[in-house]
């Protein structure tokens, strides 16, 4: 099972269309969609989906499926996890949990099924409230489609080689 956070649904759209190739998505539209989603770490515009041995192949080989969760569904799932487990989770984990909850509601999970769900970021929200960490600016920011040679040069400069 792989989950994406609506409205950024690049892999989900390709999977549901039965396409190994990602469907075209305008860069400006993609940027706007990423701004709207709560789990920004799930916004890879060039994910390892289409390549041989990538997510498409893994889902086909395992009979898997792709799911989509809204921000609201993710927030509800995250709040439920915190209420029941006593710890906050990151938005990406909440998206995965929302997708699992969707599967349960739809009867796609057997009653006695053994489930492993990777929950990340437990306690980060609490930590931020208690310690108020300062956000650092990146030393290096690349354009959307950088020249590979420019990337090599900039990284070498950054690490001093």
Write out the residue ranges for each language-model feature:
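Short glycine/serine/threonine-rich phosphate/pyrophosphate-binding segments
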Residues: 1, 10-11, 92-100
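Structural beta-sheet core signal
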Residues: 1-2, 117
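Active-site/ligand-binding loops adjacent to catalytic centers
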Residues: 2-88, 132-161
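Short, structured secondary-structure boundary patches
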Residues: 84-93, 108-114
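Catalytic phosphate/nucleotide-handling subdomain of diverse soluble enzymes
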Residues: 97-160
